[in-house]
Amino acid sequence: MATSLGSNTYNRQNWEDADFPILCQTCLGENPYIRVTKEKYGKECKICARPFTVFRWCPGVRMRFKKTEVCQTCSKLKNVCQTCLLDLEYGLPIQVRDAGLSFKDDMPKSDVNKEYYTQNMEREISNSDGTRPVGMLGKATSTSDMLLKLARTTPYYKRNRPHICSFWVKGECKRGEECPYRHEKPTDPDDPLADQNIKDRYYGINDPVADKLLKRASTMPRLDPPEDKTITTLYVGGLGDTITETDLRNHFYQFGEIRTITVVQRQQCAFIQFATRQAAEVAAEKSFNKLIVNGRRLNVKWGRSQAARGKEKEKDGTTDSGIKLEPVPGLPGALPPPPAAEEEASANYFNLPPSGPPAVVNIALPPPPGIAPPPPPGFGPHMFHPMGPPPPFMRAPGPIHYPSQDPQRMGAHAGKHSSP
């Protein structure tokens, strides 16, 4: 191999020889059986410019081949993947991680200072067990709530897709389905995410992906406690099939005494009731948007009383099973409430457009026998009685839905009406 003509020394003792790369789960791909090629001193590290061992592999079917971009020394200094340069623990850019940990690692950028700094860090790495990062990152022991909220716990394999075919964009690709590149519309060149630099990603400056995540963190929603002080129940959603009641109890017992834990396997959720309101508030604050159990991110919300949920369902047109129904199209609006006795003459009960004077005049007739006598004189004709408030068992006027839209009602009472 032809050595570099840069300012670095040509001493082979500074070159790196490794047996296996340092990669994240996303870059490795979803296939557990992959073939990796190894090339000693195949390229220069894009950070320290030293020759290192390059690994190349295909992460999956119809994915592009990937290779290591930086040496293992630079990877261990920042605790990042050798290919995507994202943090191995949180899956976030270095700029976001450093902002969450509230520290700034000023690494030298000149050639001579970088070489001296790298040699000192290699000596420190050789004296450690290799399981923890070195330098400033190794001294940061505290975790951040922002990092737990933004952490990527599951791999994102779409990042390994091929690049966009430039010939297809120009309308000249003749490979069709056999083309190894994507036939999709490219992103807007004015989009800041379209211009990314690997050195900016490593040093944590001017990273557009990090800027986007930091803006998202500043606008994250908050979980405010309900006004009803009697509510001490938390809703935990997204349990899946692997999380049990014991796993939830092991996490939430630290916040206070737990009264009951109800797991609903059908809805993959659970309701955790605490003995005191203070314990429930602490659990909600410590677990909202950052609860991860068995590698699965869970959704934590405050529980609601049955009366409040019933009112919201009637207002939103939601069934007991949680299905939102669409209102029946083509129906007129709700009728106005009955007017007072003095407003009956000008009331419009059927939402009809205004018209001229009526052609027919109502003539008061004597009541038939058996009917109550007319009101005494001076009170006017007794045509309509003012209506009071509806009984409590009647629903307020609102959107009307077809009964067939509710799957819980279809055939629910068929067995009751059938003859034995």
Curated annotation (Swiss-Prot):
One of its GO terms (molecular function) is pre-mRNA binding. Residues 303-343, 372-420 are annotated as: Disordered. CDD domains: RRM_RBM22 (cd12224). It comes from the Eukaryota. The modification Phosphoserine is found at S4, S102. A zinc finger (C3H1-type) spans 159-186. Residues 309-318 have a biased composition (Basic and acidic residues). One of its GO terms (biological process) is positive regulation of RNA splicing. It is found in: Nucleus; Cytoplasm. Keywords: Acetylation, Cytoplasm, Isopeptide bond, Metal-binding, mRNA processing, mRNA splicing, Nucleus, Phosphoprotein, RNA-binding, Spliceosome, Transport, Ubl conjugation, Zinc, Zinc-finger. InterPro entries: Cwc2/Slt11, Nucleotide-bd_a/b_plait_sf, RBD_domain_sf, RRM_dom, STL11/RBM22-like_N, Znf_CCCH, Znf_CCCH_sf. One of its GO terms (cellular component) is U2-type catalytic step 2 spliceosome. The keyword Transferase does not apply. The keyword Acetylation applies. SUPFAM superfamilies: CCCH zinc finger (SSF90229), RNA-binding domain, RBD (SSF54928). SMART domains: RRM, ZnF_C3H1. There is a cross-link at K139, K149, K290 (Glycyl lysine isopeptide (Lys-Gly) (interchain with G-Cter in SUMO2)). Component of the pre-catalytic and catalytic spliceosome complexes. Component of the postcatalytic spliceosome P complex. Interacts with PDCD6; the interaction induces translocation of PDCD6 in the cytoplasm. Interacts with PPIL1. Belongs to the SLT11 family. The C-terminal RRM domain and the zinc finger motif are necessary for RNA-binding. This is Pre-mRNA-splicing factor RBM22. It comes from Pongo abelii. The lineage of its organism: Eukaryota, Metazoa, Chordata, Craniata, Vertebrata.
